[in-house]
C-alpha cells in the first residue's frame, strides 16, 4: 500500500502541483513491479475548500494559493491517473471543509470525486 499524506502542500500552489502529479504517475507506473495493491490518502486534499470572497475564489489569495476550484480540479486530475489501475481511498481533512470555523462543514469533495 502507498500512503499519500497531506497533498494540500503540493496542490495549493501551481508551481508545486507537478510534484504531486509525479507521485500519482510514479505509483501507477510501478504498481506491478512493487505489487502495489491500494493507495490511501490521509486527507487535506486541498489547502482551502472554498474561498470566502469572489476575488480570491478566482484569483487565489495573497499567500500564493491557487483558487479553491483550481486546487480541487488539480487534485482530482492527479488521482484520476489511478482510475482503473489501483484502488484508492481518499480521506478528507479539516482543510477540505469550511474555511474558518467548524460551523461550516460544507465540502466540495463530492463535486470532484
Task: Give the predicted meaning of each segment.
Residues 52-113:
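Extended active-site neighborhood of metal-dependent phosphoesterases/phosphodiesterases
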Amino acid at each position: 500500500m502507498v500512503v499519500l499524506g497531506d497533498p494540500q502542500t503540493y496542490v495549493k500552489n501551481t508551481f508545486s502541483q507537478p510534484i504531486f502529479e509525479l507521485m500519482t504517475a510514479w505509483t501507477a507506473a510501478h504498481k506491478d513491479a512493487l505489487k502495489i495493491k491500494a493507495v490511501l490518502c490521509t486527507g487535506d486534499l486541498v489547502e482551502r475548500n472554498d474561498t470566502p470572497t469572489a476575488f480570491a475564489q478566482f484569483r487565489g489569495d495573497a499567500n500564493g494559493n491557487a483558487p479553491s476550484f483550481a486546487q480541487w480540479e488539480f487534485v482530482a486530475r492527479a488521482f484520476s491517473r489511478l482510475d482503473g489501475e489501483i484502488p484508492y481511498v481518499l480521506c478528507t481533512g479539516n482543510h477540505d471543509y469550511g474555511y474558518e470555523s467548524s460551523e461550516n462543514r460544507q465540502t466540495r469533495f463530492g463535486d470532484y470525486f
